[in-house]
């Protein structure tokens, strides 16, 4: 019996320490109490044995270059310059301005449109493969005519062809050539440890209703070249896209994901409870979506998609950078009943209900931001914003230029309505394709509207205020809980409410932090979904008023000079929070939202630089923010 006990001790010690030692043969007393104490003594170095992500990497999963048909009608900056720009090099924009990021990005996905992939450079260069078609010859002659009106009309015709049932110019060879040239370029600029060039493309379906997805490959050119971009000419049905991705994974053994964007412009079509054909959603379709769409792009140039004030009337921060008048191209007006199926927070709530009904939650997604820039330049900083496309690059009057023209003028989008947003933040173990992709798969990500603030969010059952005293909150977070994107494990022992550890540090180039909030969504016993926003930690000595709301942090922005003072707010915030309204029988999700103090919007910088006066309806200040991926609780 004595020998058995000692053997167990040896096994436990060997399992918990890198030091391997055993008892001497025939000597039952070889392991002493001091030996055991030494084995269980904490390492001297607090970093020894650490294998969790310690760095957040910032990038753009949604950038278009001259290779995209719509971008290429105006943009003359190619994919190579897009990679160079993201890596921190200076490039020349289409309009002739020099451009450079304040800091390099860590990763980039050039997601040019699958539809007629690579057509525009081939068309403009007079590629024989393209000019051999009647449409190609007609477009080439028009674009080279020197007649501005004819060129513009042809450009609009080309852009409109993206929504057709068949490509006006069909050349599989041309698409294949453009695709393999791109994947080779991505491999060239991919530099493990310094810069990650993920390979991807955009599937662009349903015209003005924006059911678009960015498809991202985990592997290199050898993997990606086993296919060509799947386009809306192959199918306009996102369910067919998921089946294509499933077949690709089956045939190659590789991994791929899809990120939908701009649900805010889908007019109620993005996050529905029906199939594409309008039938009740099935478990099979829900499982396909959950498998491939683990992330959603919630903020970008074409508006913010986290929440809407009509859906969240008690949320004073829900009205951020709204594009909510119509669908993408202004051909259908927005109706209030459409909003429920467009915004991320509401979709997360819908997912709770579908999870109970189907046994699969198709809307169990994490969050990222990206730009959707069509200039080949990933610019999301307010003072360095080059616009949606090359027709609205910086110049004195771009604030009033048309970005998207609609049949009804009241739905036309003007330059000032663009949001200088956003970026994807990824907690990965290293800056490589594999590590970045794997972090996206596990949803350990957050969205920012541009600033590169550092945000941590953990959920568990035992976090307390002592955990905020460490300068290594992640060590506590991973030990006692799960990170953003995770699922709360079952509580052990006494019934208790979940607790959360949240921390944020400001971007040194941006404003101080106003507050950190936790957004909770849950489904009650009557299967009704609900939400509530809790202020968890904030700057200054503010106290909640009778309505439970904190007073505003203040505003130091000098609009005339496009400056602000970091004399309010905090450079960092950290806190713990325990859900005061928890019911263990109710499924729920929680995510953190970090709000900055007011700072100048890009329009204020523009007015100052060019000495122009903009109309009174143009906003001049902004409160930048970050949204983490949720943490889910399932009874």
Spans of features found by a protein language model:
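A conserved hydrophobic secondary-structure block that centers on an alpha-helix together
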Residues: 169-173, 189-192, 204, 215, ...
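C-terminal functional module detector
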Residues: 23-79, 83-140, 168-171, 181-193, ...
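Bacterial N-terminal signal peptides that target proteins for export
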Residues: 1-9
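Bacterial N-terminal signal peptides
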Residues: 8-18
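Acidic, metal/ion-coordinating pockets
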Residues: 240-241
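Aromatic- and acidic-residue-enriched carbohydrate-binding clefts of CAZyme catalytic domains
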Residues: 134-165
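Aromatic- and glycine-enriched glycan-recognition loops and surfaces
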Residues: 176, 180
């Amino acid at each position: 019996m004595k020998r058995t006990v000692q053997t167990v001790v040896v096994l436990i010690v060997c399992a918990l320490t890198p030091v391997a030692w055993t008892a001497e043969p025939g000597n039952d007393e070889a392991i002493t109490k001091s030996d055991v104490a030494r084995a269980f003594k904490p390492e001297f170095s607090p970093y020894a044995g650490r294998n969790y992500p310690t760095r957040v990497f910032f990038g753009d999963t949604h950038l278009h270059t001259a290779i995209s048909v719509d971008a290429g009608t105006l943009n003359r900056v190619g994919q190579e310059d897009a990679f160079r720009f993201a890596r921190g090099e200076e490039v020349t924009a289409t309009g002739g301005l020099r451009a450079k990021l304040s800091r390099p990005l860590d990763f980039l996905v050039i997601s040019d449109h699958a539809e007629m992939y690579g057509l525009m450079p081939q068309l403009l260069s007079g590629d024989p493969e393209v000019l051999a078609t009647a449409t190609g010859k007609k477009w080439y002659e028009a674009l080279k005519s020197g007649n501005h009106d004819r060129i513009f009309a042809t450009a609009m015709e080309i852009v409109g062809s993206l929504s057709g049932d068949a490509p006006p110019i069909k050349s599989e060879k041309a698409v294949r050539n453009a695709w393999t040239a791109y994947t080779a370029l991505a491999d060239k600029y991919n530099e493990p440890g310094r810069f990650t060039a993920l390979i991807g493309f955009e599937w662009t379906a349903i015209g003005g209703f924006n059911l678009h997805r960015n498809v991202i490959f985990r592997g290199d050119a050898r993997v990606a070249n086993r296919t060509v971009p799947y386009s809306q000419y192959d199918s306009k049905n996102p369910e067919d896209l998921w089946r294509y991705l499933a077949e690709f994974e089956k045939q190659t053994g590789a991994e791929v994901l899809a990120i939908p964007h701009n649900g805010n412009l889908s007019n109620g079509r993005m996050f529905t409870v029906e199939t594409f054909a309008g039938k009740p959603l099935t478990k099979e379709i829900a499982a396909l979506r959950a498998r491939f769409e683990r992330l959603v792009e919630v903020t970008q140039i074409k508006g913010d998609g986290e929440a809407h004030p009509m859906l969240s009337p008690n949320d004073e921060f829900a009205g951020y950078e709204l594009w909510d008048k119509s669908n993408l191209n202004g051909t259908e007006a927005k109706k209030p009943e459409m909003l429920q199926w467009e915004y991320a927070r509401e979709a997360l709530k819908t997912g709770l209900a579908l999870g109970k009904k189907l046994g699969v939650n198709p809307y169990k997604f994490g969050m990222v931001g990206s730009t959707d820039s069509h200039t080949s330049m990933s610019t999301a900083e307010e003072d360095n914003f080059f616009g949606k496309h090359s027709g609205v690059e910086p110049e004195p009057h771009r604030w009033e230029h048309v970005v998207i023209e609609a049949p009804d003028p009241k739905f036309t989008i003007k330059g000032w309505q663009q949001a200088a947003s956003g970026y994807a933040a990824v907690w990965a173990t290293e800056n490589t394709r594999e590590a970045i992709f794997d972090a996206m798969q596990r949803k350990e990500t957050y969205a920012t509207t541009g600033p590169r603030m550092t945000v941590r969010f953990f959920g568990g059952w035992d976090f307390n205020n002592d955990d905020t005293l460490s300068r290594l909150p992640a060590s506590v977070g991973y030990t006692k809980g799960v990170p953003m994107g995770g699922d709360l494990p079952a509580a052990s022992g006494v019934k208790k409410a979940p607790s959360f550890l949240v921390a944020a540090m400001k971007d040194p180039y941006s404003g101080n932090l106003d507050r950190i909030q936790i957004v909770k969504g849950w489904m009650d016993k009557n299967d009704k979904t609900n939400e509530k926003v809790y202020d968890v930690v904030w700057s200054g000595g503010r106290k909640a008023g009778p309505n439970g709301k904190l007073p505003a942090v203040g505003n130091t922005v000098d609009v005339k000079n496009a400056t602000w003072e970091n004399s309010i707010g905090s450079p960092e915030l950290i806190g713990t929070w325990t859900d005061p309204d928890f019911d263990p029988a109710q499924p729920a999700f929680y995510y953190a939202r970090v709000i900055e103090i007011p700072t100048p919007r890009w329009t204020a910088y523009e007015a100052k630089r060019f000495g122009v006066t903009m109309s009174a309806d143009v906003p001049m200040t902004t409160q930048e923010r970050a949204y983490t991926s949720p943490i889910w609780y399932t009874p």
